[in-house]
Every structure is written in C-alpha cells, then in structure tokens.
Amino acid sequence: MLFDREVAKLEITDELITQTTYWKQIIDEYTKDNSNGAEIINKARIMLVYYRPAEDNRVILESELQSKPTATYADVLENVNISNLDSNMTLCQVESVEKVYDNGSQKWHYIATLKAIHKYILQDIYGDEETISSSSIDIEKLPLKYIEGMVATRFGSENNGDEMALADPSLDFNGFEEVINTLIYDRNWNDAMLLYRYIRGYSAKEIRNWTKGTSEMMPDFINDDESRLETLVRALTGFFLLPPYELFTIYSMPSALHQFEALKSNFVLMVRLIKKFINELNLGNTDKLLNIYNALTDNELFKNSMEQIKENSELEVQFNYEVERIYKWHKEYLQLGYITEDDLKLIISLIEQNQNNLSKRSSKKDTSAMKDKIDKELNKKIQSNLDKQQKEFLLREKMKAIKEQLNEADDEDGDDEYSKIVNDPVLKQMYPEWIIKAIKTERDKLKNMMSSSPDANITQTYISNLKKLPWRKVEVENLDINRAREILDKNHYGLKEVKERVIEYLSLIINHRNINKESSEKDLIKIDDHNQIDLQLFKENTKNKAQKQFNNVPILTLVGPPGTGKTSLARSIAEALDKSYVKLSLGGLHDESEIRGHRKTYVGAMPGKIIKGLQSAGVSNPLILLDEIDKMSSDIKGDPTSAMLEVLDPEQNTKFQDNYIEHEYDLSKVLFIATANYYENIPAPLLDRVEIIELNSYTINEKIKIAKEHLVEVVLAQAGLKPDQFIIDDKALEFIIKHYTAEAGVRSLKRNLDKIARKIVTKIVSGEKIDKFVIDQNNIPELLGTPKISESEKEMQPQIGSVNGLAFTSIGGTTLQIEVSWFKSKQPGIRLTGQLKEVMQESAKIALSYVRANAEKFGIKNVDFDTTEIHVHVPEGAVPKDGPSAGVTFTTALISALAKIPVSQEVAMTGEITLRGKVLEIGGLKEKSFAAFKKGIKTVFIPKNNEKNLSDIPEEVKEAINFIPVSHYEQIWEHLFKGKKSDESETESKKKKQSK
C-alpha cells in the first residue's frame, strides 16, 4: 500500500491499454517529443484500489504476498469479489513514463512512475443498475468487473466526506461557484437561461411564469444540516431552472460529488447548445446573443472543461451527440407548435432590454466614483507591495537580533560543503583569509537586499563562483618518468623525436618537484590520497625559490598540421602526471573578456575561460590545453592575445587578474600546453614565451601502422563489431589512404574506417549473417563510394619545359608541376597563371632575370627576349599558391623550355633562388620529401643549408630518394643540362646521318 509521497513503478501492459484509452493518452502525453524543454504541468492522476487475499483468490495468487506470473488484469476483475476490496485507496500522480526495451520478450515496455498524493476511504460503489440494484443478488459476492465507479473520501478529516473529495484540483469547486456568481452579477446568466429554456422547448410565457415561481420558492442558500457542496448543488439546480425529469436524474445520483460533476457537464452542454443555436439562426443581427456566448466562455472553468473534452475522444463524441439530439428536439418543438418564432423575438427583445438597461446604469455612474474606485485599486496594490517589503525587512531584522542575542554565527549558507570546510580548522586553510572575509562581506550585503532585487541574484552568483574556485587545493602528481614514457609509447606510434622532447620537458618538471620536495612538504596538508592543500599558493612571498624555478619551465607549444596528434599528446601528458585535464578552445576568439572575464556589474557577467577551467578541474594545478592558440584575433572588443601574455608569463601569472573575480589568482602551479597549426601565426611576444615542438606529417607506412595498432581497435569498440567482422590488410589501408584521404594526420582515415564499420553494422542489423568480413581493394569503392583522389599519371619520358617542384601545404607536402612555353609576341615578357600569389610571382621573375643574364652559358640560342613572351603555368589553378621555394624549379623549367632540353620526370627540386644563382634554405623539407616519395621521385635537389634536416627524414624515404644538397644553381645545371644537346640539334644530326 502506498502512503503520502511514496513512489512506485507500474508497468503499463498491453492489457491495461486495451481495457481503457486513458493509459494510451497518458503514454502519448508523457512520451511525446519535448525537445523544446516544455514540462508536463497537468499531470495525470489515478486511484489505486487494493484487495485482500482470500481462499477464492487462488486463481491469481500463489500466496498472500505473491501473485501468479500468469495472472492477468482480466483475471483479477473476473475472480476477485467486491467483498475482498480494501477500504483504503490511494490517489496517485503519474510523474513520468519511461520506455524500456525487454531483451526477454524482445518488445518495448512502458513503466510509469507513480507518486502517492493522498489516502482515501472507500464509501460507495456504483455500476450496472440491473445487476447491482437487484435484490436477489448479494452485491458483496459480485466480481470487480461489475464496478463502474466509486465514491471515496479523503482520509484524516473530520469534515463532510464529499467536501474532502474536492481536494482533487480537477473538480474546481471554487472556480464553478465564482463563474456562476460573476454571470449572475452581470445579468448574463439570466439572459442565457432565457435563451436556453427556449431551445429546450419552453414558450416565452412559460419561461416568465416559471422563472417567477422558482424565484419565489427558492429556499435559503445556507443550511446548517448540509455540507458546503450539498448547498452549492441545491442552489445551482435552482439557478439552472432544470425541468423535473432532469432534477430527478441529478438528485437520484449516489452523492453530491456526482451531482456536482453532472452540473458541470450541464453547464458545458448548455454553452455548446447556445453556440449551435446562434450559428443556425437566420436572424440578421445576432450581436446581442454572441455577447451572451462570449460571457459564458470567457472563464477558466469552461476553457479547462473544453481541454479535458478534447483530450477524451469518447467524451467529445458524447457531447456532440447530446447537442445534436437536443437541437433536433428543438426543431420538432417548432413543428409541433410548442414554441413559435414570436416567442424567440420576444425573448431576444427581453435580452436586448436587459443589456441596454445594464449599459444605461453603467453610463450614469458618477465619474468621481469611478475615479475613487481606480484610486482604491491602485492604493491597494501599492499597499500590498509595501506591506510585503516591510514584512520581509522586519523578519530579517528580527532574525539578526535573535542571532546576536544567542551569540550564534550565521552558518546558514545553503552550501553545506563550504560550511564544512570553513568550520574545519585544517581544511579552512584551503581558502586564503581574504577570500573568506570577502565571501562573508558579500553574504552580509546579500542579507540586507530584497530577494526580488536584481543585485541579490548578482551577489549570490558572485559568492557561488568564489566558493567553486579550488584556491589552495592541488592534486598529487605522479613523478615517475618511466611511466610517462610507457604512456606516450602506448598512446602514440612513431613521433620518436617529439616523444623525446616531451620526455625532456617532463623530466625538467619532475626534477624541479624532486629538488624542492623536502622544503615544500611542510607546506602541504593532506586532504585525501589524491588531493592536498598547498600553502605556498596565494602567499605574499616574492622570494619563493621553488615557485620561481618552476615558472622558469617554458610553456610547451605543439605545432603541426591537423590530425597529427597534438591534442591527444597533451592528454597523454596529463595522464602520465595524473593531472586533471582541461581543454580551452581558443579558435576564433576575438574578445579579451573571454580570457579575463566581464565585470560582475554587467548583465550575465561570468568569469573568463581560465577561471572557468580551474572551477571545472577542481584543483589549482591541472593541465590546461590552450587549443588553436594561433587562431585568436583582435577587434574593437580587445586583443585576447595580449591577455594570454599575462597567463603564460612566469613573472606575471602568480597574480593573474580576472575582471569578474576581482581577486588575484595564482596560476604558477598550472601546467599550460598550447597547440597551433602554424607558428608563423602566433604573435611574436607570445611566441617568445613558449617552446615549439613540431609534429610533422606521417608517412603512408606510419599511417598504416597507426591504423592497425590504434584506429581499428577504436573503430571496432565504437561499432560493436568483432575482429573477424572487420578484417583489413595493409594494401587495403594504403588504398584508402591514397584514394580517400589527403591529410598530414590520420583523422580522415579514422572517419573512413568508421564509415566502413557502419556499413557492416547496417548489413548485420538488416538480418544478414556476417561471421567474417574482409575489406580489400575490390569492395572498398562499394563501402566508401567512388575514390575522391585519383593518382595522376606518371610521366615516364623526360619533358621539355615541365619540371617537378615540391610544396608544403596545410595538409602536408605535395608535388608541384611547373610548365613553361615561349613564343613570339608583340607583348614580350613573362605571363604567370595558376593563381600565384605575390611572393611566388616575384620568385618566377627572379628566375627569368637569372636565366636571361646567363643565357649564353646555359646554351640558350636563337631566343630574342625583347620579342618573346614566356608563359609560366602552375597546374591546379583553383588552388592559391605562394612562397619562394619554387625558385630553382622555375629556373630549371625556363632553361629546359628555352634551350629545348628535356628534364627527367624522376627528378624534383626545392629552394629559393637569388639573382646571382644562390640557392637559399626552405622549410617543410620532411613533408616535401614524403610527397616526392609518394610520387616515385628518385632524385631531389635541396639547398645545402637544409642538409641538416635530412636526419629528420625516415630511413625508408632516404633509401628510396637520392638527396643532392646544392648551394648554387650551377650545380643543378651541371647535373641536368651540361653536355646535353637540345632536341632540335639531335633531330638535325639524325637527319644528316640518314641523308649520308
């Protein structure tokens, strides 16, 4: 049995739903899409009825406490007698309905959560009149299925039972009484009854006589022997002027509660009948009648009743039927002559007369009286507000005086955790003294504010943010360098140099901790196994050596193309040190307040990202990742980069100022790590405060190993597949990498593997049995679609005026074909196409100037540069290109075209050229070498100053490519052109030999 406020679960079975549509309505209401956040306000209610076990219940019960598993709701109704009903009942509210999948039955079930509201006592039952009213049948022995309704009273009240049953808000006892009183006061009720009686078949004469007789015989409204409900029902039946047969129907009902509900239904029926009558009326002017209808419907009682009717389709059908039935009778009354059109005209004239009289009385009211009424209402509202404020102020002053007399501290804070910490002499040290004082000051201000004041909400939010900050709370770090190395190796394949740099960086941090361990241990207070209180924080001691040494550790910045593992590497560092990990996305940030926070006086003000990150971590020494630090920008709202200078400067971040907090915060224990795609985009002052670690592109073999050792395992776990259901070899992975990805990292590769896994899962869910699934080059297009990247055809024969260059882009390295042709023209000079930007255009012009100056040496003959137009084109014109590293490639292509000497397509080059032919250093050599390796290039010319970068290139690339360092372009010319004749010379010599 459920008692008040107890909660229970109820399974809504298919049988329950078929018994009544009520449960179907509840399921639809509670499980509909509430994505807009709307809550169910009018929650459904049910009455739980209990029965006691007896001998004749063995069909449904195993014992007194256990039901048979096979027993159904229908079995209960068929086999439990009315005599077994318990007198106790519980009114419950349906709090929620949850949809749950049952693996056993392979079906969805609905589970309702019920909350008990009140206990009720069973008073009476009613049902089939022929069965229950029969004197020959013992009602007690009838099964429950004959019951159609029950009457119950709320438990625990000495008042009349019917009145307590009205505790159910849906009865709207007071609302009905108020509506009727208002309608009577405005004379609308009398007009409505005139019209209603006519519709029901009464002539104008009968209505006037009956109204007069009823008013004379109306009994006293109050009767001491009746309950309030009985008195209201008796009065309402008089106001409704019901005919005898309807009065008999109402008074024969088992209780006043049923009579009250019948009168409510009668009211709704009357209003809907009047509406239909007005719509069907052929008279020209129906404004007066519409006024009556509007008065009857302009109240919450009628609106709520109509909503309940619309929700219950059976009730809606019943009301429509009753309206049509009574209106049909009305037409028959007209045909039989019981009522006439003259009766209607007389009734309408009476209604108009009543409304005109009411209007005249209203217009004759004294203007000063109306003014006094308005003033009285305004004064009443003002006085009410003043009384409320004075009452609140008086209560606060009394509370303050009582606490002063009892000498009690104000511990009522609503934050039990904060109170517990502050009252503990040890844990209290987690908060600096000035912060505790500041919180107390703000709380004192809050006490003197009105709860409705906007400042009260601002102050409460400010206090809450101060409490949430960890202040001196730090977490215990793991200082095991071997563990750090194991975690990096486990989570990341390759990146040997990057890992070594990270290990060196961590070693420096760990060494500082170990050196100062003994001196700092005395300032550490243990909270638990994972957290401590560090008294060195927020300490007015500028000579804190440990802190200075720690601050001298540079901020690590990981720079590399997207998908190369920068974010995951930072997460691994946090895991290695057992630090909390907080990621702050700075991409697109252009407002300084996002870093420093807003002043608390602003509407909706909150702390900046740094303080929010510390609140999220819960400690003052987390690892904070500053993601995409190169993508911040400045505008009229300030420069966030300048704010980051204070955060990352070891000399300033011990006293970081957030505009919202208004207190200095020590960031010296925070381990900051930043990520960026291009260090060129990081402002110079910020770059000066960080140490750069570059993460370069992966080779195809590295991507294959990463996929096999890391990505495939993750894909299987996310898709719920077995290893045999996702078998992929190296060739298939290489095919995906070459034809479906164009990236430096492996992010796109992971997406494509996820897509394949989803295709396999779809096949399995669709009913296809797959124990083993092999992914190869043949079925990859079926799984991923048409290849997005097609390999360009490799030119096997040497070409004139076409040379392979190497470029470095955001997705890694790529080869760049440079083409040159020349012809006589009236517009001599150089024409550049292929969407070349300014620096690359200058590089091409420098190359042409160098070639013209050394044309004789390079074997360029019969070319008049003053009448020759030279066209330089870089294919893939839709892609912008820039940079000086194609200088030697431009030079080689120009010499090849002008001297008509072909260049091998297995040769590529990179380097900036000067007017004197010097070859200068370039960047991104590793990525460019990957591109050459991928295309099958055998020889690559590189600047002499880049020879040091060859150690960064994997051995497999160096074994396949011959790198030739050069300091001057003549060295390239000697390799490619020296001693070679042009195609024209060779053709002429062949002709001469043939002629001989």
Curated annotation (Swiss-Prot):
Subcellular location: Cytoplasm
Inducing factors: By heat shock.
Residues engaged in binding ATP: G560, P561, P562, G563, T564, G565, K566, T567
Active-site residues, Swiss-Prot/TrEMBL: S885, K928
UniProt cross-references to InterPro entries, sorted A to Z: AAA+_ATPase (IPR003593), ATPase_AAA_core (IPR003959), Lon_bac/euk-typ (IPR004815), Lon_lid (IPR054594), Lon_proteolytic (IPR008269), Lon_Prtase (IPR027065), P-loop_NTPase (IPR027417), Ribosomal_Su5_D2-typ_SF (IPR020568)
SMART domains xref list: AAA
Reaction(s) catalysed (UniProt annotation): Hydrolysis of proteins in presence of ATP
One Gene Ontology cellular component annotation held by this UniProt entry: cytoplasm
PANTHER family cross-referenced by the UniProt entry: ATP DEPENDENT LON PROTEASE FAMILY MEMBER
Function: ATP-dependent serine protease that mediates the selective degradation of mutant and abnormal proteins as well as certain short-lived regulatory proteins. Required for cellular homeostasis and for survival from DNA damage and developmental changes induced by stress. Degrades polypeptides processively to yield small peptide fragments that are 5 to 10 amino acids long. Binds to DNA in a double-stranded, site-specific manner.
Protein name: Lon protease
Annotated organism of origin: Mycoplasmopsis agalactiae (strain NCTC 10123 / CIP 59.7 / PG2) (Mycoplasma agalactiae)
